[in-house]
């Protein structure tokens, strides 16, 4: 399709495109049928300095389909615009539990291509220097699905390359900036492994293994906890 954002080799898993190259296949807003934003996102002519990992704090769905992923993006946009009164989806990128990667905030993909930042609404007081990845699910005491984890690694590799970021410093969790349980204790505990996996890919080494379980904790945020 003409509006797909992809490069390098890819292969199909089920009804969506999976990726194994450093530039992932990202489904555009047009493909998941996004609403028009209230106004275009502000684009800064400079890169972000941090990649912020979130979780949606929604149900840990077993549906890995493309249709489910697109519905997820629409539900997030509706919640952010109707519930929070924001101009558009807060985060720049969204990954479903099936590992499907989608553009979130308008102008995000074009900005990444240019090495710029489309300012989102995903980290209170820190939106002007961060780019956010929303991961479907609640990871307070549940494992991260392998497909989601693999896509998260690939997306972080892509962003670190595009913005010349050091994963050991750049990849953080939402709770590192704001008072929140996001991205859940299990996913947050995996961030050191994520940094190592991304660094290994950037250095040309095989990515170390998949995700493992983590600690258990109670409270979790809602979509409105992005600030």
Where are the language model's segments positioned?
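Glycan-recognition patch characteristic of GH18 chitinases/ENGases
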Residues: 67-83, 88
């Amino acid at each position: 399709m003409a509006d797909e954002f992809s490069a390098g080799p890819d292969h199909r898993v089920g009804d969506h495109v999976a990726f194994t190259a450093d530039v992932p296949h990202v489904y555009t807003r047009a493909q998941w049928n996004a609403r028009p934003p209230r106004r275009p996102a502000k684009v800064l002519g400079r890169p972000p300095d941090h990649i912020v990992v979130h979780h949606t704090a929604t149900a840990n769905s077993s549906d890995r389909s493309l249709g489910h992923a697109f519905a997820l993006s629409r539900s997030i946009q509706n919640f952010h615009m109707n519930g929070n009164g924001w101009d558009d989806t807060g985060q720049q990128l969204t990954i479903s539990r099936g590992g499907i990667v989608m553009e979130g905030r308008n102008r995000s993909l074009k900005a990444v291509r240019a090495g710029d930042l489309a300012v989102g609404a995903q980290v209170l007081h820190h939106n002007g220097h961060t780019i956010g990845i929303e991961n479907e699910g609640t990871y307070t005491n549940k494992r991260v699905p392998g497909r989601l984890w693999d896509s998260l690694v690939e997306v972080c590799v892509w962003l670190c390359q595009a913005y010349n970021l050091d994963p050991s410093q750049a990849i953080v969790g939402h709770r590192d900036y704001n008072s929140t349980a996001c991205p859940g204790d299990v996913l947050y505990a995996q961030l050191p492994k994520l940094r190592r996996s991304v660094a290994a890919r950037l250095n040309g080494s095989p990515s170390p293994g998949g995700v493992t379980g983590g600690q258990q904790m109670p409270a979790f945020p809602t979509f409105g906890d992005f600030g």
